[in-house]
């Protein structure tokens, strides 16, 4: 969820199983050409399904379940994205959320909606019995969740 230039998508594609696919979502239409260029050059274009639009509208329409979900998008919607995907993640599946420490802003009184949402997300996943969670304090913070 959140493609930007597609670097993370390509890295994830390198670890796919033989018949695996990746669905990637971004709402920035201006980045589609850049993403396509990199996906073609990488050799993984045929296993990557690009979706353009708001993730909250696209996720319900993607078929199947997920082994891994990487969230690196609009911080305000991290709690919503978790709610939309959690029941579709396979047992033992992994959810990775980037930027969860938000330059240390989550440790202070929140002054913006993104920080409030990340604080809410961090509490939500910490207290959710469906997942085991750990925050890795590298760079801007990375949450790893494993579905029980």
Positions of predicted regions on the chain:
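S-adenosylmethionine/decaboxylated-SAM
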Residues: 1-148
